[in-house]
A protein has these predicted regions:
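A structural signal for short hydrophobic/aromatic patches embedded in well-ordered alpha helices
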Residues: 63, 123, 159, 241, ...
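C-terminal alpha-helical cap/extension of soluble enzyme domains
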Residues: 4-14, 33-40, 212, 219-307
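Short secondary-structure transition/capping segments
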Residues: 55, 116-119, 209, 227-230, ...
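A general structural signal for well-ordered alpha-helical segments in protein cores
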Residues: 27, 60, 64, 89, ...
Length: 307
């Protein structure tokens, strides 16, 4: 198996128990739902939306084996394995590979600000060398608003040139289409076997036209079916469907994204345990829940009227 299939991915939210530990079985069932009925071609657990940096190392190390035991599709799961500690990133990446999940999403080391390009290069080079597996497929994780550690385009090109297929692509969470296009243009995008994934489904058609591979988004936890409807439509129906995608994305952006996606899953599943957040994040307030519920009802009414 090589790289992950292209398409629409959800940056999956994570369910926590009362003690703050991740509930692996519940996460697996949820990811299965996303791919079977939730409109997703794949899932990216333990990323930002999944509160990955708030999950213990022991839980993160155990997840890939649990996914493998549940026979989750190896080419449709991209585990977040980043850590500021190079050794921890190596261990997490090895755990994914040992379970048959070759595709990983790697944040840059984000604690020390303004690292040099050489320092960032060294971080990824050491991970690749210490993991020592040609089957590894790394998706660089560009999220400058949160990590405060952007990937210069020239560095991405250098990593791809030096490590070939191991540097499989990049998730661009900048929210800036011009930035996503710059990464695709510099690497050749899908034609150059470098898969760029913007983080907003609102730009899905522009992204695909620019040579990107799909979308990895937090709001596709709830709205991926709308994206698939737009992709399968044509003519005026496509324009209408894309507008529905944009409205849904704008609705999600009105709220703390992780808390909102968890609240939506709690409503869908009838399981309020989904609203648990890892500190410092908190669940939606009662006022936010009421507003979100009203916004979702309005979205559903608009969708029904358009059918």
């Amino acid at each position: 198996m090589s790289k992950a299939v292209r398409g629409i991915y959800a940056a999956a939210v994570s369910p926590f128990g009362p003690d703050g530990g991740i509930l692996a079985d519940k996460l697996i069932a949820y990811c299965r739902y996303l791919m079977a009925d939730g409109g997703c071609d794949g899932v990216a657990p333990t990323g930002t939306t999944g509160e990955g940096n708030s999950i213990t190392m022991s839980d993160r190390l155990a997840l890939p084996a649990a996914f493998a035991a549940a026979d989750m599709p190896r080419d449709r799961v991209i585990f977040g394995t980043g850590s500021c500690a190079t050794g921890d990133a190596v261990a997490l990446t090895k755990a994914a590979l040992a379970a048959g999940f070759n595709n990983v999403l790697l944040l840059p080391p984000f604690y020390y600000k303004n690292p040099s390009d050489e320092g960032l290069y060294s971080y990824f080079a050491q991970i690749i060398e210490r993991v020592g597996d040609a089957n590894l497929r790394i998706y660089l994780y560009h999220f400058p608003q949160v990590s405060m550690t952007p990937f210069p385009v020239d560095l991405v090109v250098r990593l791809k040139k030096d490590f070939g297929a191991v540097i499989a692509g990049l998730k661009d969470s900048s929210g800036d289409f011009a930035q996503s296009k710059a990464f695709a243009d510099a690497t050749g995008g899908v034609k150059g076997d470098f898969d760029v994934y913007p983080s907003s489904e609102a730009m899905v058609f522009d992204a695909l036209e620019a040579g990107c591979a799909g979308i990895i988004s937090g709001s596709t936890n709830a709205f991926a079916n709308k994206v698939q409807a737009a992709l399968s439509a044509s003519g005026e129906a496509r324009a209408t469907a894309l507008e529905a995608v944009k409205v849904a994305r704008a609705t999600a952006a009105k709220y703390p994204l992780m808390s909102a996606m968890k609240q939506i899953e709690a409503w869908r599943s009838g399981d309020e345990a989904w609203t648990r957040m890892a500190p410092p994040l908190v669940p939606l307030s009662n006022a936010q829940k009421a507003a979100l519920r009203a916004d979702l009802d309005a979205l559903e009414a608009t969708s029904a009227a358009a059918e």
